[in-house]
Amino acid sequence: MAITNNAHREITQLAPEDSFLVFDRIKSEFDFPIHFHPEYELNFIHNGKGVRRVVGDSLQEIDDLELVLVGPNLVHGWELHQCKNTNIHEITIQFHNDLFDDKLLSRRIFKPIKDMFNRSNHGEDLPVFGQL
């Protein structure tokens, strides 16, 4: 697909000694190119109705609230598309794929989290708190 062929390889600011990074932004547009990186990325978007989410081969218009977990090296990005809002709130958390080691994830109580990480290889759209 053309999206994958034109994806930008992002070099994140996440250093080996960091556990995670958090970016909290108010924006009027999405100007970062479609990209991929080896880290996990959890994205929360508020006031984004009409924004188009690109994850892998999937293109979807989002609602006012968006929470998605993107797995390592999965092509992703957001485009303004039909969104008219100029006050979009975006919180991004990037973390290494070894932050939660196999021993921890193999514990029974972590099975739902391990399953969520496995599904994130395709982009895991998470329910947003009952749509607040």
Go through the PLM ranges and name each one.
Residues M1-L67, N73-L74:
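Generic protein-terminus/edge-of-domain signal
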Residues A2-L14, L74-L132:
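A hydrophobic/aromatic-rich effector-binding and dimerization subdomain
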